[in-house]
Amino acid sequence: MSGSALAEAVAKYRVSVADLTVSDSVSAKNRKCVLESSLVSNIENAIRNGRKFELLTRRADALAEIRKEQEFAKSGLTAADAAAEGQLSNAQSVIKVTVESFNFGRSASKVPNLEGKYKVSDNASISMSVQILDTTKGTVVGAFPVKASSSSGTSVSNGIGSPSRAILDQALERAAGNLANQLSDTIFPITVIQAKGKRLWVNRGNDSGMKQGETFIVYEPGEDLIDPQTGENLGSAEMEAGVAKVVRVNPKVTILELTKGEPDSIGQGFILRRPVK
């Protein structure tokens, strides 16, 4: 690894994903389904693909394999150039995900006058609450909800059958992508890195969830807001400076065009946020 690449890796904020928590309001059947699903893997993949964080595994099976390699490294059969004990990195924040609601199933109705024929439609939906926990202070750095769903069109089937796994996978991938995007926006806000006329270049690429035609509000960052009673930093006094629309999404940067606001008043360091819906 080159010096610059190593420096980039060291500088990345380290996170891990905690074991999934499922609300008691989720039925036993759906609880089993979501716990056995690929949701955690999808979340980890989405975070890693975003390139903003160094993702540390805390999954028991992966840690067991790492421990096995560490034991082998002490056997005298290896060059002892890796798998050192006591060198695993600590996460600066843990991502705690709680599934508040989850549904996956198939609706079916008989087709009149056709024996054994059913109109079927598959659907999957998930609602999660996410907390970003600081591992040093034990504080909640950020919290946000995530929702996603997927459904099939109606088709005619010979019998009711079972819902398509592809519909579930699609909903979980969407949820994971939404989570990773909001995580990045919380820890590392979308920031203008260059401005020329009405064009803005920001530090997000084609794996950030930004889409051509999507609209963002542009803010000018102000002074930090400090709670006089607790000393806590409550963020900055942001002032709305304009509105911009995505015109091109590149691998590592996205270009937007200002649709509202004065171009001369917007520059490097300004922050973009999605409109609150």
Question: Model-flagged regions — what are they?
Answer:
Residues S93-S152:
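Amphipathic beta-strand/beta-sheet edge segments enriched in Tyr/Trp
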Residues S2-Y13, N123, L133-W201, S208-Q212, ...:
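C-terminal/domain-edge helix-coil "capping" segments
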Residues K29-S41, G76, A80, V120-N123, ...:
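Soluble non-cytosolic domains of exported or imported proteins
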Residues S23-V34, E69-F72, G116, S157-A166, ...:
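Second-shell loop/turn segments in exported
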